[in-house]
Amino acid sequence: ILDSNQNISPQNLFIGQQIQIPGYVGLAYQIRRGESLWAIAQSRKISVEGILLANPNITPTSLQVGQTIKIPLRITWRVVTGKRNYDYNSLVIDIRRLQTVYPFLKISSIGNSVMGKELQEIVVGNGNKRVHFDGSFHANEWITTPIIMTFLDDYLLSLTNGNTIRGIQTTPLYEQTFLSIVPMVNPDGVDLVINGPPSDEPYRSNVIEWNKGSTNFSGWKANINGVDLNDQFPALWELERDRNPKSPGPRDYGGEAPLTQPEAIAMADLTRRRDFARVLPFHTQGQVI
């Protein structure tokens, strides 16, 4: 609750002040003829006190037909919808949903893709162990993004409902760990694989040319500039340059120099700034994550 209300002083709460309760949402409900708060609470399996807390300005004995109140609803199911073609827009929608239900999430932009899409970082927890997850460095491995988002969803459900994950209590993990997640490093590439070439030029003409005239991009790993982001880092970059393609294409071209692509620059800057103790990039090949 404290992490969901960082602008509020716990020692200086006042009557009527609104705070955010993680793991709950308020559903709008219209009063029907003959209904009482007790009857509504019974039908929804919640307490009258919970309804009153969500509606501090109502008078329980003077409810009006058609009056709208908020019904507090505890979230006990996944918010993320991962089993679909998970493009950038799907990610943005799911991040927004998670932030609504779990306001203790910290969402920020660490940079932009070539085509201007925000690269979003999600931070959970406030411990000293600095851990990082990321997915979709490679465009055709986009399934790693919904897997990470589903894992995050399960973690948040466990935290707010007091459940374990495979027998492990998660509250200590939250208290001990600073978890940073960039779920989609290569959004332009992911959208290319899932939705086909963009209408924007010169990107459309370039990617079709580099893909040998085909509009089937299911094997495309690179970003929209035809650069493999995983080969963009100044760590033995010259070895990758010498053994891989020398021009833009669907895979393995490391660029003209290290850190020329905005997505790689953003990830390198984030890693230096956060000083992670552990980094777990999610990849998939041969039906293995």
Language-model-derived ranges and their functions:
Residues 1-21:
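Acidic (E/D-rich), amphipathic helical modules within compact regulatory domains
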Residues 2, 41-42, 52:
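The alpha-helix within a helix-turn-helix
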Residues 12, 36-37, 44-47, 62, ...:
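Stable alpha-helical elements in mature extracytoplasmic
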Residues 17-47, 67-69, 73:
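Primarily a LysM-type cell-wall glycan-binding module
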Residues 120-129, 136:
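Short beta-strand-to-loop junctions in surface cap/lid or active-site-entrance loops
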